[in-house]
Design a protein with these regions (language model features):
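Pyridoxal 5′-phosphate
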Residues: 1-365
């Protein structure tokens, strides 16, 4: 139940990757249609097909953004204390190199409303803020931030909004055409169940011509290519792109309304059960509009890393401990291949752990 880190690709995705790799090894390398991938992806998560770039993951995508902007002297970058290192470290690098301030605001956990989250982020904006970098859905608690409202405020102040969207594609219905923001970085290897090494970056107009490439190869300065000039990275393994196309087609066949309904149903079952476990406190909002398919919590008197090891040994349950920022929460994810039986079993294990404790993980006294 750690789909928030890595999804389990369906057979059609694995077959697409291996078949492409087999053909490359046997014959002249076949080409993957970039246009097909872009169109399929746009049909799934919205956006202009010409705005998509395919780096290896969210980390690389956000590095493209941070390194490609011409930030003026004295500019400030604003982020939060719920950002993944993959989305935040590029800004740490750029601001340290340029001797620019990187400001951080605290987000409530659990959050009570979208308005509370919006005002928490906006409280850090100053006259010098030039970039706001936040998550669409936080990796820490699964909280959904009000990106559309934040985008409107940023646009009114000529502030660049860079969104870490590692989780939403494949989890919830979304439309990049109406969501807002200047840049949207994601990792389809999570909820979209694409192969590892498939990332995406959506670049809104007019940034397709204004952003500097981080990797320069043939065509990097050909503005007629638009965002596609960022896909010119030299020789690359296109089998992962074949797998990404197969993954998007798989989700088209399922329908994102069905997918979101499934993951929300399982998460609701999980969260409702967690609320009845003694000594357990939730960091994920109770408002259904503020979360979708991840739940984070802590059990009094139980070390989350010990609990993680216990769940793995006892039932082969894979989890994620949020050790970043010293939060110490355990995070569980629910995806389409999980079942109500999976949820019931993990709730049983957690209830027993809360009442009886768990052994220390290996290597600890």
């Amino acid at each position: 139940m750690n789909n928030g880190t890595l999804g389990a690709p369906p057979r059609v995705v694995v077959d697409a990757v291996t078949e492409h790799a087999r053909r490359v090894a046997a014959t002249y390398p076949p080409r993957v249609s970039w246009d097909d991938v872009k169109s399929s992806l746009a049909g799934l998560i919205g956006g202009d097909p010409e705005g998509f770039v395919f780096p290896r993951n969210t980390t690389e995508a956000m590095n493209f953004v941070a390194n490609g902007l011409d930030l003026p002297d004295g500019a400030e970058v604003l982020s939060t204390d719920h950002e993944h290192i993959g989305g935040l470290e590029p800004w740490k690098l750029v601001t340290r190199r340029r001797a620019l301030p990187l400001r951080t605001v605290s987000l409530p956990a659990p959050a009570a409303s979208s308005e509370e989250l919006l005002e928490a982020v906006w409280s850090g904006v100053t006259d010098r803020t030039r970039v706001v970098c936040v998550s669409h859905i936080t990796f820490t608690t699964g909280t959904i931030l009000p990106i559309t409202e934040l985008s409107a405020r940023c646009a009114a102040r000529d502030i660049v909004l860079a969104v870490d969207g590692a989780h939403p594609p494949g989890m919830i219905q979304m439309d990049l055409n109406t969501l807002g923001g200047d840049f949207y970085a994601s990792s389809p290897h999570k909820w979209l169940l694409a192969p590892q090494g498939t990332g995406l970056l959506y670049i809104a107009e007019p940034w397709r011509e204004k952003l500097w490439p981080t990797l320069a190869s043939g065509g990097w300065d050909d503005m007629t290519l638009g965002a596609h000039r960022f896909n010119h990275m030299g020789t690359m393994d296109e089998s992962r792109i074949a797998g990404l196309l197969a993954a998007t087609e798989f989700f088209h066949a399922l329908g994102m309304q069905r997918v979101e309904g499934r993951v929300r149903y399982l998460r609701g079952m999980l969260q409702d059960g967690l609320m009845h476990i003694p000594g357990l406190s939730l960091a994920t909002p109770s408002d259904n509009a503020l979360n979708a398919a991840m739940v984070s919590f802590r059990i009094d008197g139980v070390e989350s890393l010990d609990l993680q090891a216990h769940l793995s040994r006892a039932a082969k349950v894979r989890t994620r401990v949020i050790g970043e920022y010293d939060y110490g929460w355990m995070r569980l994810s629910t995806h389409i291949y999980n079942s109500p039986g999976d949820v019931a079993r993990v709730l049983e294990l957690l209830d027993d752990a809360a009442r009886n404790g768990v052994p220390a993980r290996d290597g600890r006294p």
